[in-house]
């Protein structure tokens, strides 16, 4: 079924220039909220509709799910078919301030909700100064430059640097748990702060420079903010395949098995040593 995975990422790359070009015309806020309770921008719904149209007819894709949709959409019935889970426009709130955002995709080999262990590929498109796509599959992560026509140019393999350089953590500091705040104080003595409000842009900083990105469980939200199926598990797959580690505070995110489509989870990805230190500092999600 490798051709199905190829077709999905080809479709995402082909749509990327259109997503990027359409952002200026879809900056307005809607009156609606998505299934997770987030206020939607026109760009969120528009990007979701576009990516659904580009992927739902791919032979071998049986299910489509998105952060912007309440439920899974059945689009095929191929034997051994895949589920495609998308965050169509991660960091869409950055559109207003003209900062980076991206598209996150996970491909699972079973119906959703599905555990991290069922991921067969994951990737993201980053709409920054250039448009790039990072894809993890077959035990390898590679980065490509996406042209204005959707054509891709391979930029080579991606491997997480062994020496950490940057860190970025989400959430309000007053909402952090005491154990997590203590861990951050140790980290900030050695690493440089890089946090831009779009998860995928911050994760890409970690892939390039080494370090850690996370959105913790908080006093007011023990499960954190990021959606397991659409955000946490795909980025964990990418980072672990690139030689790093992931955690929800107790275990690898790839061992997480969501029971609800829009379930949230504390999320940490980065260099092995930093994630190991995090796990030691956070014995469970409530400390």
UniProtKB/Swiss-Prot annotation:
Protein name in UniProt: Fructose-1,6-bisphosphatase class 1
Binding residue positions for Mg(2+) 1: 67, 87, 89
GO molecular function: fructose 1,6-bisphosphate 1-phosphatase activity; magnesium ion binding
Cofactor(s), names only, from the UniProt record: Mg(2+)
Positions annotated to bind substrate: 90-93, 195, 225
Organism lineage string: Archaea, Methanobacteriati, Methanobacteriota, Stenosarchaea group, Halobacteria
GO cellular component terms, semicolon-separated: cytoplasm
Biochemical pathway: Carbohydrate biosynthesis; gluconeogenesis
Residue ranges crossing the lipid bilayer per the database entry: none
Organism of origin: Halobacterium salinarum (strain ATCC 29341 / DSM 671 / R1)
Subcellular location: Cytoplasm
Disulfide pairings: none
């Amino acid at each position: 079924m490798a051709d199905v995975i190829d077709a999905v990422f080809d479709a995402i790359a082909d749509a990327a220039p259109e997503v990027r070009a359409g952002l200026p015309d879809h900056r307005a806020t809607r009156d609606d909220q998505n299934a997770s309770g987030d206020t939607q921008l026109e760009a969120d719904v528009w990007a979701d509709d576009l990516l659904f149209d580009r992927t739902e007819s791919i032979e071998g894709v049986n299910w489509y799910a998105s952060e912007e949709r309440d439920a899974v959409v059945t689009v095929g019935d191929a034997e051994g078919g895949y589920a495609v889970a998308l965050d169509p426009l991660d960091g869409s709130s950055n559109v207003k301030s003209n900062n980076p955002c991206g598209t996150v995709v996970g491909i699972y080999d079973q119906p959703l909700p599905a555990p991290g262990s069922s991921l067969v590929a994951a990737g993201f498109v980053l709409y920054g100064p250039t448009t790039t796509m990072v894809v993890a599959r077959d035990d390898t992560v590679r980065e490509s430059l996406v042209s204005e026509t959707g054509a891709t140019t391979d930029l080579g393999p991606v491997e997480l640097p062994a020496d950490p350089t940057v860190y970025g953590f989400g959430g309000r500091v007053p909402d952090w748990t005491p154990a997590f705040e203590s861990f951050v104080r140790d980290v900030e003595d050695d690493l440089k702060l890089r946090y831009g409000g779009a998860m995928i842009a911050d994760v890409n900083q970690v892939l390039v420079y080494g370090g850690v990105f996370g959105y913790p469980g908080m006093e007011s939200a023990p499960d954190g903010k990021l959606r397991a199926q659409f955000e946490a598990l795909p980025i964990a797959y990418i980072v672990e395949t690139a030689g790093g580690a992931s955690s929800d505070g107790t275990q690898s995110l790839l061992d997480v098995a969501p029971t609800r489509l829009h379930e949230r989870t504390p999320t940490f990805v980065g260099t092995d040593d930093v994630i190991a230190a995090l796990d030691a500092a956070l014995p469970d999600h409530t400390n």
